[in-house]
């Protein structure tokens, strides 16, 4: 990761990862995040609400339009948090996204991007990362959206669909952090 200009950290527990993530977010920052069970389960969102941050939370939108506006506003946050669908052993991030808001923010958005990655997401190559993203992550992620009617919702595996409900519209491989240390990766 460091050879690819990412800032990298390893934490052996989720509590250590939570502590490290909070250290990387300056007080007073506007902060938002992409859909991530990793971030939610480690307690990071809850910790942010207890801290001195301006929170941009698309889930607080009451209507589809409000949710969309909050997702767009997240692109301009000071700090953006996410996980990744896969991390190759040579340090490349692999992500699949439905609307593109998460991968857009990671690629060219906030000045401070923090990615939390479980060791279960580490794969040999970026090609293996795409396989993991399509055949493991996407079928699990679509379960969070009960209204989606995709083949993987039923079969549990990617069917390479072109459904209007598809959550795999964008596949992005981040091979380098163009601005050194803009993207911080915490492996837990």
What are these regions (language model features)?
Residues 1-71, 75-81:
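N-terminal active-site beta-alpha-beta segment that forms phosphate/nucleotide-binding
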């Amino acid at each position: 990761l460091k050879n690819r200009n990412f800032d990298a950290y390893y934490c052996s527990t989720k509590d250590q990862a939570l502590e490290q993530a909070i250290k990387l977010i300056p007080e007073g920052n506007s902060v938002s995040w992409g859909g991530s069970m990793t971030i939610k389960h480690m307690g990071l969102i809850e910790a942010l609400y207890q801290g001195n941050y301006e929170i941009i939370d698309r889930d607080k939108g009451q209507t589809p339009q409000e949710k969309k506006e909050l997702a767009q506003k997240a692109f301009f946050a000071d700090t953006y948090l996410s996980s990744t669908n896969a991390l190759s052993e040579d340090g490349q991030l692999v992500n699949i996204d439905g609307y593109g808001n998460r991968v857009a923010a990671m690629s060219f958005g906030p000045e401070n991007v923090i990615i939390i990655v479980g060791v279960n997401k580490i794969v040999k190559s970026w090609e293996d990362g795409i396989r993991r993203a399509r055949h493991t992550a996407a079928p699990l992620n679509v379960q969070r959206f009960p209204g989606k009617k995709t083949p993987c919702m039923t079969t549990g595996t990617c069917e390479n669909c072109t459904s209007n409900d598809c959550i795999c519209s964008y596949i992005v491989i981040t091979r380098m952090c163009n601005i050194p240390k803009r993207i911080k990766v915490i492996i837990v």
